[in-house]
Amino acid sequence: MNSIPKQSARYVPIFAAVLAIFFIVLSPVQAQCPIPDIAHTSLLEANQPGMEITTAQLVDFLAQRTPPVLDVRFPQEYAISHIPGAINIPPDSTADPNNVQHESGEIAARYPADAPLVLTCNGPSCGKSKRVAKALHDNYGFTNVLRYQLGLPVWRALGNTVQTDLDGFAYIFNRDFTAVFVDARAPEAFRADTVACAVNVQKDEADAANTDGRLPLLDKGARVVVFADNPQMAKIVAAQIAKKAYWSSSYFSGNFEDLENSREMRIHSERRCHVSEAQHTEPEHDDD
């Protein structure tokens, strides 16, 4: 059997002591610098215009209603889905998408240059908020521009719901025949009148609806739009549905009467129901 040489053996206690001291010193450092969870981190990009904020910071800002959160996407994108509380500062639809003069000029006209504000758009790969932040600094002297660069995709991925406005609801209703519309009103109101092919899901029913067929269990990416007589109730139900991994869920910012009175869609048309049923029906197979 091989044995450790005497000369080497002398260093084993010394090495063990050094290692022990290393861990003793390191432990307080680790305690002081804990690894942040996903809600408390950002992309950590270096040398970019505007300081990044985390999702947790954005939640706090939205709750306090300050600083303003500015969504710099196109109006239709915003209407279909946006972070609740965000304000749309749209681009000039006729301009080069890389030209952000319209958006930066609009922001400069609304807010003082020393005011903090948050820019957001379509997530980590969206360069729009960076370009607007740079234009605000270079052209208008803004000094406190923040960016939620994680944007709408990560906001949703972390289980947060989003808001759909009337134009966005109509766009989804008229074009997306796989979308599921959830009526969060009382069952008696739902039975009396509702959107064609809607399902009734009440507060605290998301667990049951996830498995009983009311929600598309096997298609978590399907759009799920919740409406009610009170947008706040729709938001509560939509938030609960989002927590069941329906990352493309949202709530309607108006009420059922707004949907009934809309000229952009016929909410009682069952044409979309038949198309949706056909798309979700499995083809029949011969027994041969």
Regions found by a protein language model. Give the residues of each.
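Rhodanese-like catalytic fold shared by cysteine-dependent sulfurtransferases
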Residues: 6, 23-52, 79-116, 123-180, ...
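Alpha-helical protein-protein interaction elements
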Residues: 14-15, 70, 103, 147
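Bacterial N-terminal signal peptides that target proteins for export
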Residues: 2-15
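Short, charged low-complexity linear motifs
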Residues: 63-64, 141
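Short loop/turn hinge sites at secondary-structure boundaries
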Residues: 64-65, 176
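Bacterial N-terminal signal peptides
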Residues: 14-25
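Mature N-terminal segment immediately following signal peptide/propeptide cleavage
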Residues: 52-62, 68, 72-75
